């Protein structure tokens, strides 16, 4: 008698939370850092050239990998006149000073001498690599750790230097947006004003308009953290789906996604911002937009912002399945 086989179940979709978003060359360089080799990092940054978007993305992730080792310092010691070594060293110092701040706990001041030394490393890198926007991104990042912030004129000067080199640098704008957030040295209103002003001048196809959705995530985090142990916040369930949130979501989609070259593959440096926009679309109930964005992402997921609203993998899978994304 023939044995009837059970139909095999389709394998369950699993998101890929690759921190490098599929950038294999970056993954190899980060592995080199772990084992103390800097030559692969040097070669990667040389090959990246003046593709500022990709370079900023790669340097940010390389600096996180380098913060727990002496690889960045070893490279700079071996090649003190290599501007890329100076830029990575400065970015790595920024990560380290943030690690110190996190370890000390919120509200604990960071050692002023360490902050000043980090700023000096960034300014040195800016002199060594005058065309590179990354040292200015690093400065805008470390600025928010100063108790009371930095003088407005100085902050504005750093931002102007960034924009002279890369006027639509999303990472640099994101760092300044966080500076102006209520969590740091501003208010929700100041943060949204900055995001909307930046989005308004971005050219079609630029991801910069997603700053408005980044601001919405920052506001959500701030309110949710403040409500811990105090019960639900009135009206908070409409945070993602009220009229203005939906209007701005659709505007970002139109200006960024609608302005991209049709059929152009999604690059690794776009994945984090695309996750932010997809998250906003899912929670706003914008079915067609969410379906398109999740389709563009495929399996490429980022922990942020999904981790702020629940378990990242569960949400990513649930929305994909609910929207019929294949």
Task: State each model region's role.
Residues 1-79, 291-326:
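Extreme N-terminal leader/anchor segments
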